[in-house]
Amino acid sequence: MVAASLSPRALYEEVAELLRQRIFSRELEPGSWIDELKLAEQYGISRTPLREALKVLAAEGLVTMKVRRGAYVTEVSERDLTDVYHLLGLLEADAAGVVATEATDAQLRELQALHQELEAAAVPGSEDRVRFFAINERFHMQLLAVANNRWRDQMVADLRKVMKLNRHNSLLKSGRIEESLREHRAIMAALVARDSAAAMQRMHEHFKNGLEAAA
């Protein structure tokens, strides 16, 4: 890839996104050293925008900068996971409570449509784990959008980036797809019933169980 092929937005932002996807796909594995010279050559750029991109990823928690050693893909510890899931549970439970009382009927129908896609991706015998988790994230992002708090949205977006570093573990746990789907059904039922307290509780339980699957 050469620099000329990158989009018009700031070069370092484009490079950050390319690296972000390589980290999420585990092409760049947790704990691995990031070879700046090799990457700069691959992308046909100087090391300056690459270093700016690494600073962005470091701010997101995806990359760890070590003095005189360079940049490494962050390894997520058990404590990191506990902290991230705890905060996500608080933030998204609060959002679910807001949605239960303030969402329009049309907005709830949109969430129900996403939930049906989730059901379709989890049909026994033909379940698609990658698609399931992609739709799952869309559902959560849509719920946050309905709750309409940009500061919460930004915090959740950053936390979810760190969560993705460990997603492969939860994907591999036997039965997690079915468990997650049951939890989503309970969340959706509480939202449709306009039961704020139940929606908050079901969402909190969802993240508690998600942590157990990811650990």
Language model features: what each stretch is:
Residues Y12, Y85-L88, F132-N136, I177, ...:
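Amphipathic, non-transmembrane alpha-helical scaffold segments
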